[in-house]
Amino acid sequence: MLFATLEHILTHISFSTISIVITIHLITLLVRELRGLRDSSEKGMIATFFSITGFLVSRWVSSGHFPLSNLYESLIFLSWTLYILHTIPKIQNSKNDLSTITTPSTILTQGFATSGLLTEMHQSTILVPALQSQWLMMHVSMMLLSYATLLCGSLLSAALLIIRFRKNFDFFSLKKNVFLKTFFFSEIEYLYAKRSALKNTSFPVFPNYYKYQLTERLDSWSYRVISLGFTLLTVGILCGAVWANEAWGSYWNWDPKETWAFITWTIFAIYLHSRKNPNWKGTNSALVASIGFLIIWICYFGINLLGIGLHSYGSFTLPSK
């Protein structure tokens, strides 16, 4: 009872905080000069992170197993992972290029997890026999870590495509473009500072210098993030294969979840392979990664929505009216 009450409190704190953060984030996108609000948004993210961490620890202690047994718990863990990705550049004291992707991703994931759609999953339940294994934490956590990382990398690639295919793109009037500020807020500040510095120089700068510089940074970050995510996905699939052999007597059953996990792995393997070809590097490889973004959501959320196959534990069903 104590843990259930604590989880309830932490869930409401995280949902309330995330609602405030969403409001602040939207305001800062519309009014660029309000830097103080950006700091408040970051503090709200920190408060949400500690609330999520407390929730995960509380449920782990109360249930006796790592909280990854249904869609609700996995979404909470996914938002926690996205915040970790958001924090890594800050710990390294480097420019946080990922913040424009990780911040809204964390907000949306946590907001959906704590919404009323998953109410029936809020209560911790006893694991079914197939899930009562030490592989639960290893396999599922690796898969969710890979999903979070690959989603961030795919969004960076999608951002690259948006910039390259947008005609008449004026980097000197970005303040008027709310959509671009959503994805490239920190990049815009960097480009404004760069432009101001170069105005005082005497050497010529070609017109698309700023656009080229931004796309190169996005391409580099996307490749690095997806490479990490692909490694985590590979480890997660291998762990799942070993677990499947213990639980069902076969390493691979072509279950819908397994099939889409293989498709996801193949898509990002193609992306990494295409990076070795100079003719495919950049726009073409970014297109492959953007397709991967949709594939990940089908693999992770779509299969749970259908509730079919051997991986249908804790699947999501729409509440009846």
UniProtKB/Swiss-Prot annotation:
What are the alphabetically sorted keywords of the record? Chloroplast, Cytochrome c-type biogenesis, Membrane, Plastid, Thylakoid, Transmembrane, Transmembrane helix
Q: Per UniProt, what is one Pfam family of this protein?
A: Cytochrom_C_asm
Q: Mainly localized where?
A: plastid
In the bilayer, the protein is annotated as: Multi-pass membrane protein
Which biological process terms from the Gene Ontology are attached to this UniProt entry? cytochrome complex assembly
Give the transmembrane ranges: 9-29, 44-64, 68-88, 143-163, 225-245, 259-273, 288-308
Q: Is Membrane one of the keywords?
A: yes
Subcellular location(s) of the protein? Plastid, Chloroplast thylakoid membrane
Subunit annotation: May interact with Ccs1.
Q: What does this protein do?
A: Required during biogenesis of c-type cytochromes (cytochrome c6 and cytochrome f) at the step of heme attachment.
- Family the entry assigns: Belongs to the CcmF/CycK/Ccl1/NrfE/CcsA family.
What is the protein's given name? Cytochrome c biogenesis protein CcsA
Q: Which organism is it from?
A: Zea mays
Q: What is the lineage of its organism?
A: Eukaryota, Viridiplantae, Streptophyta, Embryophyta, Tracheophyta
